Regions:
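Sec-dependent bacterial lipoprotein signal peptides
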Residues: 1-19
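Acidic, polar-rich low-complexity tracts and alpha-helical solenoid repeat scaffolds
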Residues: 18-249
Length: 249
């Protein structure tokens, strides 16, 4: 038997084995009722056995999509995927739940987990231990996380997750402002004053209350002065003196 034919047969065997394993797994769970699957899945979840938990919880949706246990399994599996650090699947499960139950009992939780996932999904383990290095973070996922928490608070202001979501929004705001300020300083140091002023302006307009607002105003003032835009510089100076009377540029 030649090598290419042998490899072809092996590949076919592997494909059949993979398919058979998948089919066997589904078949092996058919003798469970929806309630048994939910109980087993939640027990595995409590033991931090996320892989098994996901298998049982997902089986409910596949085998018993219209049973009352399906709705609970859909919220449980969001948490299981999140804890397993399968962030893409966690987001998919959360989005599906939100689509199916836009005003559901646990929809606030789905938004909350989306916010957590978007904050953590592109960070390394080192960034999770030392989250202050804003220059290393992905701004787009931070912004997505901010929007998730913001949506949660708007739609479910009395949610048990609302207070923590608000705290996380403030933290994200400060990280975004820190990143924008670093960029503004980068442009200013290279005499790209228009770009520096624009970055600083973004902080003031969109990240109100961040500790970086003071430095952003200073960069705007100095940038406008360097550009010879005296009117804009004086406008910024008035705002600076009004809000930070003890500061000097």
């Amino acid at each position: 038997m030649n090598i290419s034919k042998t490899l072809l047969i092996c590949a076919g065997v592997l494909m059949l084995t993979a398919c058979a394993t998948k089919d066997y797994s589904a078949e092996s769970l058919k003798h469970y009722t929806a309630k048994q699957l939910l109980t087993t899945g939640e027990q595995a979840l409590a033991k931090h056995n996320y892989k098994d938990s996901i298998k049982y919880l997902e089986a409910i949706d596949a085998l018993y999509p219209f049973d009352p246990e399906a709705k609970q399994s859909q919220i449980d599996v969001i948490y299981a995927y999140y804890k397993a650090e399968d962030y893409a699947s966690a987001l998919g499960a959360a989005d599906r739940y939100i689509h199916l139950y836009p005003s559901g009992e646990h929809t606030d939780y789905a938004y909350y987990v989306k916010g957590l996932v978007n904050f953590e999904k592109d960070r390394t383990w080192l960034q999770r231990i030392h989250p202050t290095h804003a220059e290393e973070l992905d701004l787009s996922t931070l912004q997505d996380s901010f929007v998730d928490f913001e949506t949660l608070i708007k739609l479910f202001p009395k949610s048990v997750y609302a207070k923590d979501a608000e705290k996380r929004m403030l933290h994200i705001r400060d990280l975004l402002a820190s990143r924008e300020l670093q960029t503004a300083k980068f442009y200013f140091d290279r005499k790209a004053y228009i770009a520096a002023a624009n970055r600083a302006s973004y902080i003031i307009k969109h990240l109100e209350g961040a500790p970086q607002v003071l430095d952003a105003l200073k960069i705007m003032f100095k940038s406008y002065r360097a550009l010879g835009a005296e009117k804009q510089a004086n406008d910024v100076l008035r705002i600076l003196q009004m809000n930070f009377p003890k500061e000097h540029v």
